[in-house]
Amino acid sequence: MNKSGIIILNKPKGLTTNHLIQKLKRKLNVKKIGHAGTLDPLATGVVICLINNGTKLSDYFLNENKAYEVTMKLFQATDTYDSDGSIIEEQEPFKIEQEQVEKVIAKFNGLAYEQEPPMYSAIKIDGKKLYEYARENQVVKVNKRLIKINSLSLDKYENNEISMTVYCSKGTYIRSLIVDIAKELNTIAHVTSLNRIESGNFIIKNSVNIENCEESNLIKMFDAIKMADYEIVELDDTLNVEHGKKIEVIAEKNIVFISNKSKELIACYERENGNVFKCKRGGLNI
């Protein structure tokens, strides 16, 4: 397939994100493939797959907010913060009232805070991924990251399990959030299920399973950027844009995509001053 754009897949449990996109690459005979945000093997849900020139749009989808459905199991901790890991601590269950759970959830609802990523993650330190250090039992300093829990709501609390829906900023680790929530409840916990239901404006009901995915599921680059709420300016003459020169356009936003009249994305531009824009990312069509 020579076309470019994105495909929204619903990742099944047990696959790595890379394994998923490689399966898609083989199935559709794609030359170049990528994704805009990894999911843990245990997790399911929305993965934005970038096809051919669509890989050049990675940053513009990575920066979007996310939404998840998550279930946490109380009184049991694992090294990976989820049920794929080894149990490292267990507590005798004790009574936690639903009112307590609701109070803690309310505390995190709308909260911006410095979150510590889990050691079992793909963050790189000195060129090496954190999970590689963890597997070698090496202790490294991990910088906390400012994240925001835009919305957190309780869906169900029973049998020592708490199910919630989370809307959060990019870079949020749900596994770490669950550990932080457990601390506020004076206990330990780990994730037993995690489902990404939204990535930016791309939602799970519009996703497709890898088994049913076809070329017709491709969303063209122009349409994908429009769906992501970026501003697109169509020009009759795109010669200056193709050469990466500054241009003058009237636009509402500071970041705009430039296309020709055939709705082919050419480049991404950012406002320099007034109506003058400079090239931020060119060659989107080549």
Curated annotation (Swiss-Prot):
GO terms for biological process: mRNA pseudouridine synthesis; tRNA pseudouridine synthesis. The keyword Isomerase applies. Signal peptide: none annotated. SUPFAM superfamilies: Pseudouridine synthase. It holds the Pfam family TruB_N. Keywords: Isomerase, tRNA processing. GO terms for molecular function: RNA binding; tRNA pseudouridine(55) synthase activity. Gene3D superfamilies: Pseudouridine synthase (3.30.2350.10). Belongs to the pseudouridine synthase TruB family. Type 1 subfamily. Responsible for synthesis of pseudouridine from uracil-55 in the psi GC loop of transfer RNAs. This is tRNA pseudouridine synthase B. It comes from Mesoplasma florum (strain ATCC 33453 / NBRC 100688 / NCTC 11704 / L1).
